[in-house]
Amino acid sequence: MSVLRGVRVLVVENDDMNAMLLDLQLVQAGAVVVGPVGEVRDALQLIAADAPDIAVLDYRLGNGETSEPVARLLSERGIPFVLATGVAIGSIPSGFERGVILIKPYLSEELVGALSKARESRGAEG
């Protein structure tokens, strides 16, 4: 599976095991993983320094943070993202409306499909 060959994917996930699994899934799909990072500050710095092509965000991060500021910056810059979360869809804030929602747990194929959908929808907007 090399659907994402060469695509730079920012991973924002604070759980080490989930981040490691996500990294593995993305590499197997051909992506170049940026991160993973588990804090908003680190994600914003990576976006500012070298913008990724797309991102995968967990909603709830450590220390009471959410990835909403990251989603806002990505949206402002026209960078598509997938929100991979276990949070019920009805309780996801509007800051994530431009992303593709992927409910945990998910299969690798579903992750790749969500990333492809996010890239296609962003391409249709631009």
For the regions a language model picked out, list residue spans one by one.
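Non-catalytic signal-transmission and effector/linker regions of two-component phosphorelay proteins
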Residues: 1-10, 41, 103, 107-126
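Conserved acidic carboxylate
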Residues: 13
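Two-component/phosphorelay signaling modules centered on CheY-like receiver
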Residues: 16-35
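Acidic, metal-coordinating helix/loop segments flanking the phosphotransfer/catalytic sites
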Residues: 36-54
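Conserved phosphotransfer cores of two-component systems
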Residues: 48-50, 73-78, 90
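Conserved phosphotransfer microenvironments
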Residues: 57-75
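Hydrophobic/aromatic residues positioned on beta-strands within the core alpha/beta folds
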Residues: 82-85
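As written
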Residues: 94-102
